[in-house]
Amino acid sequence: MANSTGKPTSSTQEDEEATSATEILAQLMQDIIDREEDIDDEDDIDDEVIDDEDYEVASLPLLQESQANQKQSREREEETEKNQPKRFKKQNMMKINIHDFSEETLRLIEVWYEAELDPQDIFGDNEVTRLFSRPIKKQLMSSDVDKDQCMLMLSKEQVKEKMLPFLEDSENPVKGIDVSVYGPDGKVQQMEFKMWNGDKTPVLTSGWKQFVEDYGLSMTCDFVTVWMFRHIKTRKLCFAIHYVKFSLRD
């Protein structure tokens, strides 16, 4: 339809634009179909098949970046482990200075570290609990036996995983918890279990110094195994500690 000037009406313009848009859309659809057919044809040619893994990485730059970061992380971990004895790399829970010990002693330390000691041996026939925590093993350092500080420092991650589940809601290690600590001969001493240096490091203190003196513990050569448990009768929070000495290199 035209107006008095002979120009197409707005309705005609809209029809033509709709027709043009339809034609463009149809052409785009045909182009897509043609490209898919080309891809199907290429898939039939063995030497032009795209490897799935390469395709995914090329299509996902974030994945490619993630893989690169993972590789860098593995390289950093390998670099960190270079100075650690091979036998301790898998556990990666207790690092020691290998230069302090002979190869024979390092093998003995490995056996000790992997062995599952029975804490009930400390108590003999006396039943104090039916459930011990999983043990924490560590080499005593200067901070553990220094007379000016003298507190047994424990791994925060291991305490969180192995020991904190034994605590009751009313027990707050940040404020400090009075505990009974059983030595390797079954003798008991009173100590405090608390978070030291803010809430960064779990420690046994307020009695640990006497424990060190009673058993003649020393840095480097002495290694301890520590369990937590709740006394079967008193329900009091307790620790059991066993230690072993290894000879230092001459």
Curated annotation (Swiss-Prot):
Instruction: Write down the Pfam families for this protein, in alphabetical order.
Output: B3
- Region listing for Disordered, in residue ranges: 1-90
Q: Name one GO cellular component term.
A: nucleus
State the compartments where it is located.
Nucleus
Q: Which SMART domains match?
A: B3
Q: List the disulfide bonds.
A: none
Q: Report the protein name in the record.
A: Putative B3 domain-containing protein At4g03170
